[in-house]
A protein has these predicted regions:
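Rossmann-fold NAD(P) dinucleotide-binding segment
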Residues: 53-114
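Helical "substrate-binding/catalytic lid" subdomain
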Residues: 166-272
Length: 289
């Protein structure tokens, strides 16, 4: 069973290509504007459509939770009402270790086997074969099940939260660089020095040019900023649990959230300047409102 049929959940189902998967997404009942699209996506993926989380997982031996980070705890509670004894609950959500430990307590009390899973790359290129870290008491048995589904799990020895810790701390840099890029190139473009700044940065690296990277980062933030901001709030919890002040992370949350809430698609807009122009036009329109 799959709980949450956004990008991750739908990609898993497409990658598996199985007809014995049952799926549910809370937007089927909470958002009438999206419900029809969710139903159509599930039909296209050839999965059975559940009516709610509890009934969707009731007969499932394996349950994959792929909701947004801010809904992960609620999803665990909802699944606990229907999970079978000994069923495996794979928590793929981008959550703080302490959040996953709370989720584990709920699933364990309900009789399920909780598995901490961290998805370590964008899921679209490789779908179900995307690299994933797996931790917790049931990790080894869970990995055997994942391998049977042609997935690519890697065991991280340690308790629930260990895999998530690696991802959360990595995200400080990955999502932080995106936010810094937005801040840097917004200022550089407004100041009329984007080419000079990019050239200076290009001279210090050997991979893709910084303007290309900045254009890519902008698209990622407008497309996935809301979800990434939710993940970064969990990163902030992770840092707080480690007694580290997440000053940069706070700024990252603000940038990801702001651009994600623009409702802007940049997939058909090529290049840094056109993408920044679209972003700042949308931001100016918000100010006018």
């Amino acid at each position: 069973a799959v709980i949450g049929f956004g990008e991750a959940g739908s990609c898993l189902c497409q990658g598996w290509g199985r007809s014995d998967v049952r799926a549910f997404d809370i937007k089927q009942i909470d958002d009438t504007n999206i419900a029809a699209d969710k139903t159509r996506q599930m039909q296209d993926a050839r999965v059975s459509i559940g009516d709610d989380a509890a009934s969707t997982v009731r007969e499932a031996d394996m349950i994959f939770s792929t909701v947004t980070a801010d809904q992960a705890h609620a999803a665990a509670r909802a699944v606990a009402a229907g999970i079978g004894q000994g069923a495996y609950f794979f928590d793929l959500n981008s959550c703080a270790p302490s959040t996953k430990q709370k989720n584990a307590a709920i699933i364990t009390e309900a009789g399920g086997h909780y598995v901490d899973v961290a998805v370590m790359a964008t899921i679209t290129p490789k779908y179900h074969q995307t690299a994933m870290l797996v931790a917790g008491e049931h990790a080894e048995a869970a990995i055997a099940l994942m391998l049977a589904l042609d997935m690519k799990p890697v065991h991280v020895p340690g308790p629930v939260g260990r895999a998530s810790t690696i991802k959360m701390i990595r995200s400080v840099l990955v999502k932080g660089i995106e936010a810094l890029t937005a801040e840097c190139f917004s200022a550089a473009t407004i100041a009329g020095v984007a080419d000079e700044v990019a050239a200076s940065l290009d001279a210090s690296q050997t991979k893709d040019g910084w303007k290309d990277q900045a254009a890519y980062n902008m698209e990622r933030m407008t497309t996935h900023g809301i979800r990434r901001a939710a993940e970064m709030r969990e990163v902030a919890i992770t840092l707080a649990d480690l007694n580290i002040a997440g000053r940069m992370t706070a700024g990252t949350i603000a940038w990801q959230d702001q651009l994600g809430n623009l409702g802007l698609s940049l997939l058909d807009t090529e290049g840094l300047e056109p993408r920044l122009s679209a972003i700042h036009t949308a931001l100016d329109a918000q100010k006018g409102d």
